[in-house]
Amino acid sequence: MSKWKKFTSACLVAALSTALLAGCGGEKKDSAAANADKYVIGASFELTGNVANYGKSTLSGLKLAVDQVNKAGGVNGKQLVVVESDNKSEPAESGNSVTKLITQDKVVAVVGPATSGCVFAATPVVTSNKVPLIAPCATAPAITVDNGQVKEFIFRACFIDPFQGRVMAEFADKTLGVKNVAILHDASSDYSKGLAEVFEKTLNEKGGKVVAKEAFLSKDIDFKAALTKIKAANPEAIYIPGYYEEVAKIIKQTREIGLNVPLIGCDGWDSPKLVEIAGPEALNNTYFSSAFSVQDQTESVQKFIADYKAMYQKDPDIFCMQGYNAGLVLADALKRAGDGADGAKLAAAIAATKDLPVASGKLTYDKDHNPIISAIIIEMKDGVQSFKEKISL
């Protein structure tokens, strides 16, 4: 999930070119054979650039999973080795990052990138080389399915955008008890537009109504004109699907004009920067969908939190958890595929994952390579995240 979900044709051309170069560089050695004494896992993440926080967090979770697997004896008698590659938060660089991991480091699979745009750009490369890729937190539906066709080598470890859009409409209807809702979305983000569309459709199905719908653009800083129009429509709540950079400013300005209705959003809100920019008081009576909360008392969640804190001396966030889950999925699939399995056999093993114990509970893949999981609703109280409820649809 991220603002890089805008998958431009230029990015596709760059990625396709990279994939062709990867395929034309002479005979490609089988990646498993090249590292006979270990399994090398490629970690292509946003380690610098605009969304480096996402990439670094996700990578930390992956490393924890690998550390635990190795300490338990590894997989098929081999240790797992993570090779990092920085895609610089740029879709155009993502293809280069993954190409290097496949052609030079001979990885058996790729975990990452964190953002949908970078995953889209990496997809032609891994597909042409028949190397599975698990995207820990890329939520765009088209990541795993293109025009009804499931992508054989692409998987994810998070819920998809339509799911969290429906979840928040359910929350608005059942928990908040509101029917008249305004929407303020980012017209420059496929992520935001997609969430707004699904939320509105689901709300209408439940007998609700969108009384105002306004838009902004990424990097905007003044939202009061749109908010004034929304205020005039007298909404009972406002749905703001977007990223913390803009959302924090929107929340602050919403309160400044005296609009104190509940504000609800999505997993793009999840960042400490949200509190820094908006301020703790403005965030009261706000809620967003996520897949993780440190206050979730589920046994598997609390064990993951304790293990993560023991390794990193701080609490994990949603991205850490999703990276961790992706690592466990890959390790389990490597074991079931067997030593020496090629990319197609490994991909089939990933697709067959069923009831695998992970941080969030038990993970099973559906036919579209998406995990079947629940959503968490986070409530902000004086700048602190609070577990509100868990929703399964």
Task: Give each language-model segment a name.
Residues 35, 39-63, 85-92, 114-115, ...:
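Extracytoplasmic "Venus flytrap"
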Residues 251-324, 379, 384-392:
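Extracellular/periplasmic periplasmic-binding protein-like sensory domains
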Residues 28, 54-58, 68, 72-145, ...:
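Beta-alpha junction/loop-to-helix N-cap segments that form part of ligand/metal-binding clefts
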Residues 47, 151-214, 237, 330:
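An alpha-beta-alpha
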Residues 126, 196-289:
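Extracellular/periplasmic bilobed ligand-binding domains
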Residues 1-40, 71, 392-393:
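Short, low-complexity disordered leader/linker segments with a strong preference
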Residues 310-320, 331-385:
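Segments of small-molecule ligand-sensing domains
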Residues 94, 157-180, 193-195, 222-224, ...:
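Hydrophobic alpha-helical segments within soluble ligand-binding/sensing domains
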